[in-house]
């Protein structure tokens, strides 16, 4: 968040921004609007945020191209969390798995599959951010989430006692 708030200033100064930071594009509508406005400066600075959704897949570029060529986006489907996909593939009591959920989350974190703080994945915040980013690329939806990702309803998998734990090491 601390760097993302400077993106409009960077853009107004003529610098392009390349970032995997979801927070800049899924947070407050004010910051999102300021970034969009700054992109219109005479110097035409560029913003590359492709890896904010879909890691290395060209999800954002494809969606932008579809919109730019006049296609109407009716729905977007996909697995929006590789972390949750991994965790649920590993945690399968029906298949006889005896590994604790917390151990699977810990392994996922050690392997670099989770966000820096796994609570972002387990709370639903990471998916809510990605949904917000995608919706803001679609005309008619761009300004529908005034509180950003906080406007998206989620259901957390985090136990109540850990929900506010800021230290990722303690959380896991």
Model-derived segments and their meaning:
Residues 1-7, 100-105:
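Structured alpha-helical segments in the cores of large, soluble enzyme domains
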Residues 39-42, 48-114, 124-125, 133:
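Rossmann-like NAD(P)H-binding beta-loop-alpha module
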Residues 99, 103-172:
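Substrate-binding/catalytic subdomain of NAD(P)-dependent oxidoreductase enzymes
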Residues 17-18:
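A short hydrophobic/small-residue beta-strand
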Residues 2-13, 22-50, 55-66:
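Rossmann-fold NAD(P)-binding glycine/threonine-rich loop
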